[in-house]
């Protein structure tokens, strides 16, 4: 997928004027790219548009104009773009009870190690590869970045909406498997095609 450059970024003052229209577009896009795996885990599959939105929001919130700092943000988010034959997602552990955040998060220690989150298509599975640095022995982050590298035959299954495709998480006492809607699979296929341009 083509990297986001400084020329793609709207200065935050101008972005403020366009923000509502931009947000409506991204909210609609994210609805097709977001899936809940049970009551706690959500995956949002990222692409150039979703990441550009996050960059714009960060620059706006922090009032960043310095070209060096803008480039720093671009570097962080460009690293999350899917590469060739790859899907990239943000995994969120969503805990709404503020008093139990640490206790509940601790139950997910180790989620980012081993074969815990998978896309399953026609009997084949591809496990998510988590970005490092989001947990250590005593603490786990609520936000993770995950990459999936589906095989060519899995990609063909994504395109055939008569064949089932699921996403599964299996960690400790948390077991969920959810069917992926056709709209999400269409987004995946676009990402996999776009990734070839990276």
Residue ranges and their predicted role:
Residues 1-88, 95-198:
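Long, contiguous binding/interaction regions
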